[in-house]
Amino acid sequence: MANAYKQAGVDIEAGYEAVSRMKKHVQTTMRKEVLGGLGGFGGMFDLSKFALEEPVLVSGTDGVGTKLMLAFMADKHDTIGIDAVAMCVNDIVVQGAEPLFFLDYIACGKAEPSKIENIVKGISEGCRQAGCALIGGETAEMPGMYSTEEYDLAGFTVGIVDKKKIVTGEKIEAGHVLIGLASSGIHSNGYSLVRKVLLEDGELSLDRIYGRLELPLGEELLKPTKIYVKPILELLKNHEVYGMAHITGGGFIENIPRMLPEGIGAEIELGSWEIQPIFSLLQEVGKLEEKEMFNIFNMGIGMVVAVKEEDAKDIVRLLGEQGETARIIGRTVQGAGVTFNGGKAL
């Protein structure tokens, strides 16, 4: 039977076209350490020029979750790749690692070359922001597994750090200052609740502007996750950082303790930073308690850094020079977990 594979739902020619379209975007991410080109069986990266005493490779993998469903609804696919990169590289930079390279995995019901090109365009933009090379990936057309409009997206990154410079959090003490770096919005966590609250129960439109939002709801919800790699690496060159937390799923309550040693907690000063209007809209429409908000969302802070009190103001200034909005949002205390304003739990 001629074209048997195509009749089964797999279009090889469309796959070839997608690869051809993505090459120009991938090329913009290349570093001098990359060996070979796109299309090999494996991506190669030369580590011989890194003058580190005890080089340690740090890896991370993640996906975008149900934020993808917003991309499907809006038929907008050119920024969701930034989210995939951000979720991976932010996780390894908190350990002091410089991201070196990234690989992506796209699984779809139907290979549409223009859509796949847009996804990879976003991935490439994320890699440029993080300074890492997109050295490989997989695009799998899986009819019957996904509908023709659906796809899933995941990524994998590897970075490097000198062993003596790994940021572990183990030296954090009571009295260290916590600096928060502003998020761009919801980032890539909590979207199952976002859809239920705003779209299903609230019946809000993606095309309308609500409350204090400056953009239509769909654009607000699809804002890419902020990538903190370059400002954090610059910070690490100039100051000692005792711990870092990427505020993802689980919000403040789950993620800040991940960087803290036993016997140390965090006290957060509410009102010390701006909480973006999208979080207020979610809380109002969904009638969500404040504790639940801080246990799910980043609430306007995408990264938390623990430093000595005497360094805090200089670090806020340095981060500002790197284009970040940074605020002193609290400090570490004897205890455990996260409390707010004078030791009160929400």
From Swiss-Prot:
Disulfide partners: none
Pathway linked to the protein: Purine metabolism; IMP biosynthesis via de novo pathway; 5-amino-1-(5-phospho-D-ribosyl)imidazole from N(2)-formyl-N(1)-(5-phospho-D-ribosyl)glycinamide: step 2/2
Entry's family note: Belongs to the AIR synthase family.
Keyword line: ATP-binding, Cytoplasm, Ligase, Nucleotide-binding, Purine biosynthesis
Organism for this UniProt entry: Bacillus cereus (strain ZK / E33L)
NCBIfam families, per the entry: purM
UniProt name for this protein: Phosphoribosylformylglycinamidine cyclo-ligase
Gene Ontology MF: a single term: phosphoribosylformylglycinamidine cyclo-ligase activity
The reaction(s) this protein catalyses: 2-formamido-N(1)-(5-O-phospho-beta-D-ribosyl)acetamidine + ATP = 5-amino-1-(5-phospho-beta-D-ribosyl)imidazole + ADP + phosphate + H(+)
One annotated GO biological process: 'de novo' IMP biosynthetic process
Location in or out of the cell: Cytoplasm
EC primary class: ligase
Highest taxon above the source species: Bacteria
Predominant location: cytoplasm
